[in-house]
């Protein structure tokens, strides 16, 4: 499954982005990290799109107290959306 995540930030985008980059090994265990997209929407919002996500593993990672502690000073809220590719009209 492909997932788009809106990340509401407590910190600056730059501080959060460094944390995000440093966590690529953990992310690679739940998705195709080579396809991950990340960007700054505004000063307090980041956007992340991940592909080929193992949803059970993602849920376990986000519920992990270690992950929550790591992100608590950076992230106010993660808002995930599932993505479905559109089939072009014939």
Task: Please provide the spans of the model-predicted regions.
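Short, low-order "capping/linker" segments at domain edges
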Residues: 85-90
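Short, well-ordered beta-strand segments in beta-rich or mixed alpha/beta enzyme
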Residues: 2-9, 38-64
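An amphipathic, aromatic/His-enriched active-site/gating alpha helix that lines ligand/cofactor pockets
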Residues: 21-36, 51-84
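Short, surface-exposed ligand-recognition loops at beta-strand->loop->(often short) alpha-helix junctions
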Residues: 8-19
